[in-house]
Amino acid sequence: MPNSQIRIYTQKEQGEEWLRRYRGSLPVFGCVLGFTETGLIPGISAAGRTPEDRKYTACADAEFLYYGPEHKPQHPLPPLAAGASPVLISRAVFESLKIPVHLFNAGLPHPPAVPLIDLGGASAKCLSGGAAMEITTVHHLFKQGLLWGERLAANMQESYVIFGECVVGGTTTALAILTALGIDAAGKVNSSHPICNHGQKWALVQAGLEKAGDRGQGRQGEQGEINFQSKIQDPKSKIRNSVDPLQLVAAVGDPMQVVVAGMAIAASRSCGVMLAGGTQMLAVYALMSAIAQAYALSWQPEAVVVGTTRWVAEDPTGATVDLALSLEKGNLTQSGTTPPLLATDLSFADSRYPQLRAYEQGFVKEGMGAGAACIAAHLSQNWQQDKLLAAIESQLERLSTAFH
């Protein structure tokens, strides 16, 4: 089987066609770093043991991705309750395959100590307030996304671009955006916890959408264009097409979402696109669809796939496949579609490191393009399980010996 290391969960034919088309080609990787104060809520995320740690998770991941394990980082990888940062996976592949990496700061509280492209964004406030970002910032970030998506795709006609993310608390903002777009996502998202904290996420999302709804009514008289409140009673209802999806991001989103949406819309016009992640990238895909419709932008949905890990796709405490299929049923677009959802078959069950075996218990799961990196290794060099595991374990080994 040519794709024995890659599982296709939705849109099988389209997924197989995409894999056929890009077999043997080397992608470039664009990683968008963002921050939402939602990530500081106690218990919301396992990506950093304390809220203070979580402020620096993206900085630490970016440094490791860029410099590797021998570099003495300004921000070391944060201690996790269990597991190890997924950046070990991405770094193992990108270093071995020499895949070019471009880092983008969409809005971080502290800039990372790596060469990156600053998009002039800002961190988002907690989504529970219903006013996460200034609309001017959202518009600016979207334009930057379109610009950089076109640039990254410029010489990639026969290949594809991977867009990844690092946003602590990002599955909660993803739930908020999906819900605001009329997609029934409650109880279907993932998290970095072994058992997803659905109740905590949903309470924050409800609070944020209600506050955004109140604000919408205040601004536009009685009718309130963004009538989120009826949405919450009926998550399946579709918001009227007059609602600006960028306004939804301003209300309850994070800076990464709108940047990657812009990048992927622009890149899809000239090359393949793999959105690297699970829940967060399904939200980005839904957002792309809604933005393209609202602003009459051309894009190529059939060029886009979502690539993640098996731990996300088969998370028994989420429902990723069901969520992917739900994109057709909600969405501000009449032509809401489900993208092919691909996942690497990578397993850590036989790893000699307990931090990696923790992934098999449901910790961490994904981030920094980890799943997509493994898919790329298989597509371009036909890497199998043993080669992937050895490369990832080598990163961990080098990290543990680097400063001892």
Feature annotation, model-predicted:
Residues 2-164, 168-216, 238-404:
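N-terminal loops that bind phosphate or other acidic moieties
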Residues 214-240:
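Short, C-terminally biased terminal segments at protein or domain edges
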